[in-house]
Amino acid sequence: MPRLLAPLLALCALLLATTAQASYITRTLNKPVPGGVAVVDLGPAASAPSARFDGKPVLVVKEQDTWLAIVGIPLTQKPGTATLSQGTRTLPFSVGSKKYPEQHITLKNKRQVNPEPDDLKRIDRELAEQVKAYRSFSPGVPSNLILDKPVNGPLSSKFGVRRFFNGEERNPHAGLDFAVPAGTPIKTPANGKVILVGDYFFNGRTVFVDHGQGFISMFCHMSKVDVRPGQVLRRGEVVGKVGSTGRATGPHMHWNVSLNDARVDPAIFIGAFQP
């Protein structure tokens, strides 16, 4: 029996050592599916390397003696092999598959499903503002990658859900919805800078916070905004209050997280991701 037990114990020790050596960031954030995050090891370097995915710069952080790229994977990404570029070299990584459920919503305001021509002009202007914010890339290192919940409350709608409004399919749900009362304070989940404040056709009152290197939080449908563009925020500071402005059926807190201009599942950053 001891002779049989020794190899088994050695194998267990090897597996435990391998797990322990895995990066904490990798273990926590690496969810490489459409709408998820890939953590790619860039190796050691004297200073922070730069990397790009789909031509866009990605967040790079150091952990122990190596640099890691934290790559946002868009919902439109096909499963298979994707490629990160770092200077002249390319780094492949695998993207798995994930099936997202459907959600059917009935809206009384038909214009919020099929906007009128004047609405469409407004929507186009507002979209251009928001795209510019999502593509912001400041040099700062995020204060924390494991984020705080902006509010305490149950989830009412998950990320990636295929949405049908009055029977017509529209864009997938690009964030998390929390079922909390109107007026609930919304707190920034990490240090950041307010880069955009607006009152939009679909999103209602909205705030974008840049946490550094394309790591962006967006909060919308707010009843009140308590910050201004350019304001620097510390983790836990209030950005505004929960509401139901824009295309909303009732009060809730909607939170988007974006990496390299890809909307990704905020649940990954609060330990609530479900494969």
Please provide the spans of the model-predicted regions:
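Cationic-aromatic interfacial patches
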Residues: 22-99
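Surface-exposed, glycine-biased beta-strand/turn segments
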Residues: 26, 92-203
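Intrinsically disordered, low-complexity acidic/polar segments
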Residues: 49, 60, 78-80, 102, ...
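Short, charged, solvent-exposed linker or helix-capping segments at domain edges/interfaces
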Residues: 53, 103-106, 267-268
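Catalytic cores of peptidoglycan-degrading enzymes
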Residues: 148-275
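Positively charged n-region of N-terminal signal peptides that target proteins for export
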Residues: 1-6
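Bacterial N-terminal signal peptides
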Residues: 7-17
